[in-house]
Amino acid sequence: MDIRLELLKSEDEEQFIRDNQAAFNYGAEQYFTDEELKEQYEEEGQIISRETIVSSIHRKGSIAYRIIEGDKKVGGIIINLKNTFGDLEIFFVVPNSESKGVGQAAWREVEKLHPEIKVWETVTPYFEKRNIHFYVNKLGFHIIGFYNEFNKDIQIPEEMDGMFRFQKKTGQ
């Protein structure tokens, strides 16, 4: 499998956003009825809003990559780096390319490109069992928190309700 990462080009940003939304919608559609799905939307018809993606792409310290297989765009990753800490903000594989090792190969590339990062963190919603499996069993992350009505904290934003937080230490 020929997987590589390319920096997101400004002329591809709009398609990146659409692909990201399609992938996140696809994941949620596997778990919710149409009525339940509406309760999960950040914006009309979208699990992840355009604003969330755009702000992640353009946040200080962020790097956005396209995941490329051969000559085809099959996903995307947005990371935010600060010294030896990395925040995996967005990670998606387009629906027809999932479950083929694309995500694992892409993550290996991220770690190769950023060996200075010693601790990675990310979050995913409770209903995304495939993501939880992927982060824990395939990439070696550990669950370090579950934010819900029983684990409220003024420092945890309301939109984190129902989210697992993961961490991966890559070195000392």
Predicted regions and their residues:
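A short beta-loop-alpha structural element at the N-terminal edge
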Residues: 4-31
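Conserved beta-strand in the GNAT
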Residues: 64-66, 72-80, 87-92
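A conserved beta-turn-beta hairpin within the catalytic core of GNAT-like acetyltransferases
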Residues: 81-89, 98, 116
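Conserved acetyl-CoA-binding loop-helix of GNAT-fold acetyltransferases
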Residues: 93, 99-112, 137
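Conserved GNAT acetyl-CoA-binding A-motif
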Residues: 113-126
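Conserved catalytic-core motifs of GNAT/GCN5-like acyltransferases
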Residues: 123-127, 132, 136-163
